[in-house]
Amino acid sequence: MEKISAFIITKNEAARIARAINSVKNIVDEVIVVDSESTDDTVAIAEQLGAKVIVKPWLGYVGQKSFAESLCVNDWILNIDADEELSKELQDEIEYIFASHNQDRYLAYQIKLLIMHRNDQKPRMFAPFNKCTRLYNKKFASFANTVNSTTHDSVVFNKDVDFAGKIYLLNEAAYHYSGTSIEQLVTKANFYSSEQAKDLVKQGKKLSNFRLTTEMIWWFFKAFFIRRYFVFGFDGFVDSMIFAFARFLRLAKLRESLLKSKNVIARSEATWQSRKNNKNSTN
């Protein structure tokens, strides 16, 4: 049976890391946890569960996952986040594919991540979900192939790989627990929006006042209605507002960075002009 390496990146995930590790450890050969200097018991819990833990200062989402990926000894890699859990049915499906030696029919496998509200014990009917490539052969794809972003961490195929028809969506699902509290969601929104704003600056993105003023409205509509957060009731309304605010924040922070940069340039030009005038008056 082809062996699988699993990796998880963490930061103060003591409350959730055990659930994540326990959902993968029986179907993989190794579990690697790359921790970005947690101040809680994340490292101790992960080690107690048999994971190999490496502490690494934060490199950004893409950098951290690329580093973790590089530590995996096997070609087949399974990545989940600390706030995710493979269902028993998904564990069995993956185990069956590899036990029957059929894994190489595809280069990568997508997983449906069902969004679980923090107060739920099981998925709600019609719960929203995301499809993400999380099980893949690193000979053909890698997180390290992501360019121009430190936040949009995704598995990207090598340029010379024809992956048409080579990605399979697994039938069973994993669970994504959206947050532990409103405070945690707001803290994450603030951090993540700052990282996204840095990416936008690097990409040379511009911003209109119209987009800034309509961003929250659009993303609330998208989260609550299109992504079906309404299935969580009023809690879904609250979470949609936080999500929309996070999208607004990234643009507000982009605007702030652009204004600061503009002011720095203006001051530099004024200083240069002043020195030029002083030099001319001296002559």
Swiss-Prot record:
It is an enzyme of class 2 (transferase). InterPro entries: Glyco_trans_2-like, Nucleotide-diphossugar_trans. GO terms for molecular function: glycosyltransferase activity. Keywords: Glycosyltransferase, Transferase. Pfam families: Glycos_transf_2. Its EC number is 2.4.-.-. Gene3D superfamilies: Spore Coat Polysaccharide Biosynthesis Protein SpsA, Chain A. Belongs to the glycosyltransferase 2 family. WaaE/KdtX subfamily. This is Uncharacterized glycosyltransferase RF_0337.
